[in-house]
Design a protein with these regions (language model features):
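N-terminal, active-site-proximal structural segment of metallo-dependent hydrolase catalytic domains
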Residues: 1-70, 74-96, 168-175
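Active-site beta-loop-alpha substructure in enzyme catalytic cores
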Residues: 141-143, 150-180
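Metal-dependent phosphoester-hydrolase catalytic domains
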Residues: 165, 179-193, 198-261
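Short coil/turn segments at beta-strand junctions that form active-site/ligand-binding loops
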Residues: 43, 151-152, 186-191
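Short catalytic-loop micro-motif centered on adjacent basic/acidic residues
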Residues: 46-51, 157, 193-195
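Catalytic metal-binding/acid-base residues of hydrolase active sites
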Residues: 9, 52-53, 159-161, 198-201, ...
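Structured beta-strand-rich core segments of catalytic domains in phosphoester-bond hydrolases
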Residues: 52-150, 246-247
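A short acidic, glycine-rich active-site loop
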Residues: 22-30, 131-136, 217-221
């Protein structure tokens, strides 16, 4: 099974793209198509995207999924909501900013999951001389799916916060939910995968989870990567080879890919 995770940074062209003029929509669209074609050549089975922008007349998810021939896909908007009811109302919209998931496998179950993200919007500024400030944190989300491979697999695609201890809480919440999904669907021993921009360095992620790190490679920043904050983790899988990264036409992250069995 080939797994790919990529933070697309809203489809912004980067300096690696010949002739790129940053900020111009037409150029960004061309860069998105080129990046999507590059990933399609890898023939991924599972694709997780972060910082996805879905607007009228423009769909980053569709560009990547259609290029790779992935029929099954899901977008989850990262919108603030004070209640689960309002969150469900917001999720009816297929537009906005969020995360996305696509796969070539049949999907038996799929759901967007809100992760613990609500923080007091009023806080002391980092430079305390300027007192207090108001800022709404991004609502962090995950997409959890059960894939019908030769044996069922539970997959969680996500984009976690940079803040601790919230980051650890979000990862724990996702792992617990995936285990519960497996039990409720009668597949408690099903292998599980978590992939995405986890905003945590490799040495820290190894302390936060019992999942095995399946891909080790520097992913950020895109031009001269010095750290790995994008990860592919698993239970019941092992890496079938070394992880690969690639600088594509969009984003300040590198794409991360690995084969597992």
């Amino acid at each position: 099974m080939r797994l790919v995770s990529f933070n697309v940074q809203s489809g912004r062209a980067n300096q690696s793209w010949v002739g790129a003029v940053l900020g111009e929509d037409a150029v960004n669209d061309e860069a998105v198509r080129e990046a999507a074609a590059e990933i399609a050549r890898l023939k991924p089975d599972v694709l997780a995207l972060q910082e996805v922008r879905e607007d009228r007349g423009r769909s980053i998810l569709s560009a990547f999924a259609e290029s790779a021939g992935m029929e099954h896909r899901r977008f989850a908007a990262c919108r603030r909501a004070p209640s689960n009811f309002m969150a469900r109302m917001f999720r009816r919209s297929r537009r906005g900013y969020g995360i996305a998931f696509a796969t070539a496998y049949p999907v038996d179950y799929i759901r967007a999951l809100r992760l613990p993200s609500w923080r007091n919007p009023v806080r002391r500024a980092s430079d305390r001389r300027f007192g207090w400030r108001f800022r709404l944190e991004e609502q962090r989300m995950a997409i959890v799916a059960v894939l019908l491979t030769p044996k069922p697999v539970v997959v969680g695609a996500t984009h976690l916060t940079t803040k601790q201890p919230d980051n650890r809480k979000q990862l724990r919440r996702l792992e617990d939910f995936m285990a519960r999904v497996a039990r409720r669907r009668g597949i408690p021993d099903a292998p599980r995968i978590v992939l995405g921009d986890l905003n945590t360095h490799l040495e820290d992620i190894q302390k936060q989870t019992e999942y095995e790190v399946l891909a080790q490679a520097l992913t950020y920043p895109d031009d001269e990567p010095s750290s790995q904050i994008d990860h592919i983790l698993g239970v019941g899988f092992r890496a079938a080879g070394d992880a690969t990264t690639r600088r594509l036409a969009v984003s300040d992250h590198r794409m991360l890919a690995v084969d597992v069995d």
